[in-house]
């Protein structure tokens, strides 16, 4: 594909039957054996994803913690060394620049994991707000490959080829210098599927060997490579948000029900804090809701939500859920129509189909939190 970037794993996709698409400027596999099969593999067994297109940045220096807090809505002070935090990075109006993971290595050393489509924008935003903070910011995206191994059997399989007890890496914790098939990696118990699992950061030159080693280790258990199609249905069922769908620079964390990750009572200031405090006091005018389509059809991103002939919002993500076997979606609607049980219509092509607001936590799976 012309002018598209590739990850260090580009050469292995076809070996496994990967169908390649353009995603965020990268050649990436949308599926291997079919996204339904892959979706169920992750829910029931374990699946391996190439997520090397994600961005990474290091922030180091005396003021690293203070600087990260100035950029992020969550409370960075709660992070201990070798812990991970999910957070938003907002603009002055409270709109979301990105949602990302902050890895704390030490008081003066942080590692940020950035959405692929926002890499350049995020790094520029971070650099532009350095000000007088005593920090060094380095975009390390090109020197890191990232694999995600997700599913109920992920720990059991990965344990065969690592030199540490994976049970010691708790949910949203990390360990550096883990030998995975003899190669030094950073391993965190994190993911984007709603299942237990790990994200593995390695040198680009080690990625192919690790890919083959993990799949070979899980051959008996039925581990499979997974494409972008199933990655999206898995995150959607678990009500994990996607930048560009559920949020963007005009949508705030409060509007999408993620106020828990915007700590408005902390002493420290952060970009967007005043706007979010004001919005919380006044109340949001729109909300992200889950819905089930009652008529036959499939809701898609961008479809209008209609009540009594009036457009009240739009679908952010919609699918026929492979796990629940029904057409469900997320929609950003006017606040007065956001209560569970509210009925409205979704305009699918030229027809208005009946839908009802439901709890947006469509699927929950216990992860290891202890």
From Swiss-Prot:
Gene Ontology CC annotation, any one: glycine cleavage complex
Keyword Protein transport attached: no
Keywords attached to this entry: Aminotransferase, Transferase
Catalytic activity: N(6)-[(R)-S(8)-aminomethyldihydrolipoyl]-L-lysyl-[protein] + (6S)-5,6,7,8-tetrahydrofolate = N(6)-[(R)-dihydrolipoyl]-L-lysyl-[protein] + (6R)-5,10-methylene-5,6,7,8-tetrahydrofolate + NH4(+)
Metal-binding among keywords: no
Highest taxon in the source lineage: Bacteria
A GO MF term: transaminase activity
Enzyme type, top EC level: transferase
GO BP terms, alphabetized: glycine decarboxylation via glycine cleavage system
EC number: 2.1.2.10
PANTHER family: AMINOMETHYLTRANSFERASE, AMINOMETHYLTRANSFERASE, MITOCHONDRIAL
Described purpose of this protein according to its UniProt entry: The glycine cleavage system catalyzes the degradation of glycine.
Subunit structure and binding partners: The glycine cleavage system is composed of four proteins: P, T, L and H.
Protein family: Belongs to the GcvT family.
Official protein name in the record: Aminomethyltransferase
Organism of this sequence: Clostridium botulinum (strain ATCC 19397 / Type A)
